[in-house]
From Swiss-Prot:
InterPro entries: CCDC181. Homodimer. Interacts with HOOK1. Interacts with HOOK2. Interacts with HOOK3. Residues 335-375 form a coiled coil. Residues 46-120, 241-367 are annotated as: Disordered. It is found in: Cytoplasm, Cytoskeleton; Cell projection, Cilium, Flagellum. Microtubule-binding protein that localizes to the microtubular manchette of elongating spermatids. It comes from Homo sapiens (Human). This is Coiled-coil domain-containing protein 181. Belongs to the CCDC181 family. One of its GO terms (molecular function) is microtubule binding. The gene is CCDC181. Residues 243-266, 300-334 have a biased composition (Polar residues). Keywords: Cell projection, Cilium, Coiled coil, Cytoplasm, Cytoskeleton, Flagellum, Microtubule.
Length: 509
């Protein structure tokens, strides 16, 4: 298996190398051919530019010289003789300046054309040679093995996902027919309350309801006509629900009355007395009776003042915002007085519960704050007592240390310290006396030499005083350390020598 894998890998590597070599060779050949063509074009442009420059120099030279005939005869004689001269015939008159210039330009143009044709032929010949060489190389190459695995692969199906064609439009037609049937059921509907104050009229043409752009219907309200949206009326609960839009128009349908199930603390309310009697006329003329009640969420709907003439003339609803007022007559979608009272009682109970909850929260927060203050004060008092106790213990220890030092002091050591202090005091007195004498002698010193000598002596004296002070400080610290060490040793000996029974000792107090 390993040998097969090795052979496959070698073949794939050889194939990749061949493919890369072929690509590199083709790219190099294309680059060489492009470079050769560009070089030939550049050479052509250079030759043309040189010829034009020569023509310009010749023209300037002819203009500068005063004798144009002689200069033209000297410069252009060989070319003109080659092109214009006839054997056995001598020129009758000298050629004018304009004729000589024209003949010279024509000869130049012809020479340029000849050069361009020769260069074009050379380029064509070079390209043909390259093509022949490439064909020979392709013929000499080995035929490509179609069985070997290729690096570049293409799918059999370039398109992975094909979008199916559009389905038949019968489904859309059925959908629109169902909607028309549904509107046909509601084509002629009269909705009114028990008192006959409000009517809703739906017009029907040819037994079917055509979809309007706005889906509006004509509504009679308090003797006024309005164009309202069908969706708004359906959402407010005017229209009865339709069980099946695809059912036949001749089948009578009856809608059972709904009772308002809004309850307070789990009890049902009374059924509302206001009902809607709706009668629909099908295309054959058979009446269909619907009995419906107002929806559960019945709210007071303000009626807007609408100009009836404009609505009749234009056939569209007036969308201008106008002052709204509540109808004095109790409509089918208004709350009854009992329901209003119950709703008011519910709102009062909710507000009362909300106020009690807020009051309870405020009291709890105050209680928590009071407890936190008490706990903080107790902690602070405890910390103060601890600090005072620590200070008292530290002061007692310091007093004991001072007493132990005085009791355990060596008399010889004390005498030495006293003697040293007296010696230091005497030294200080002598130094002060010397300073006083020097100050008195300064008045008698004359010149700069005496002043400099006095200043140097003063500096030397200051240095010595400073060194003496440092030495005294060192000696004092050394003595204090020795005393502390000796006192600790004595305490240790006393503690070890003293026979102590087993007893409880409170180290913190």
């Amino acid at each position: 298996m390993n040998e097969n894998k090795d052979t496959d890998s070698k073949k794939s590597e050889e194939y990749e190398d061949d493919f890369e070599k072929d690509l590199e060779w083709l790219i190099n050949e294309n680059e060489k051919s492009d470079a050769s063509i560009i070089e030939m074009a550049c050479e052509k442009e250079e030759n043309i530019n040189q010829d034009l420059k020569e023509n310009e120099t010749v023209m300037e030279h002819t203009k500068r010289h005063s004798d144009p005939d002689k200069s033209l005869q000297d410069e252009v004689s060989p070319r003109r003789n080659d092109i214009i001269s006839v054997p056995g015939i001598q020129p009758l008159d000298p050629i004018s300046d304009s004729d000589s210039e024209n003949s010279f330009q024509e000869s130049k143009l012809e020479s340029q054309k000849d050069l361009e044709e020769e260069e074009d032929e050379e380029v064509r010949r070079y390209i043909m040679e390259k093509i022949v060489q490439a064909n020979k190389l392709l013929q000499n190459q080995e035929p490509v093995n179609d069985k070997r695995e290729r690096k570049l692969k293409f799918k059999d199906q370039l398109v992975d996902l094909e979008v199916p064609p559009l389905e038949d439009t019968t489904t859309f037609k059925n959908y629109f027919e169902n909607e028309r049937n549904m509107f046909g059921k509601l084509s002629q509907l009269c909705i009114s309350n028990d008192f006959g104050q409000e009517d809703v009229l739906l017009s029907l043409t040819n037994g079917s309801c055509e979809e309007n752009k706005d889906r509006t219907i004509l509504v009679e309200r308090d003797g006024k006509f309005e164009l309202l949206n069908l969706q708004d009326i359906a959402s407010q609960g005017f229209l009865p629900p339709i069980n099946n839009a695809n059912s036949t128009e001749n089948d009578p349908q009856q809608l059972l009355p709904r009772s308002s199930n809004s309850s307070v603390s789990g009890t049902k309310k009374e059924d509302s007395t206001a009902k809607i009697h709706a009668v629909t006329h099908s295309s054959t003329g058979e009446p269909l009776a619907y009995i419906a009640q107002p929806p559960l969420n019945r709210k007071t709907c303000p009626s807007s003042a609408v100009n009836s003439d404009r609505s009749k003339g234009n056939g569209k609803s007036n969308h201008r915002t106008q002052s709204a007022h509540i109808s004095p007559v109790t409509s089918t979608y208004c709350l009854s007085p009992r329901q209003k009272e119950l709703q008011k009682q519910l709102e009062e109970k909710r507000e009362k519960l909300k106020r009690e909850e807020e009051r309870r929260k405020i009291e709890e927060e105050k209680e928590k704050k009071r407890e936190n203050d008490i706990v903080f004060k107790a902690w602070l008092q405890k910390k103060r007592e601890q600090v005072l106790e620590m200070r008292r213990i530290q002061r007692a220890k310091e007093i004991e240390d001072m007493n132990s030092r005085q009791e355990n002091r060596d008399p010889q050591q004390a005498f030495r310290l006293w003697l040293k202090k007296k010696h230091e005091e005497q030294m200080k007195e002598r130094q002060t006396e010397e300073l006083r004498k020097q100050e008195e002698c300064l008045f008698f010193l004359k010149g700069t030499e005496g002043r400099e000598r006095a200043f140097k002596q003063w500096l030397r004296r200051k240095r010595m005083e400073k060194m003496a002070e440092q030495q005294a400080v060192r000696e004092r610290t050394r003595q204090l350390r020795l005393e502390a060490k000796r006192s600790k040793q004595l305490q240790h000996h006393l503690y070890m020598s003293e026979a102590k029974p087993f007893r409880f000792t409170d180290h913190y107090n």
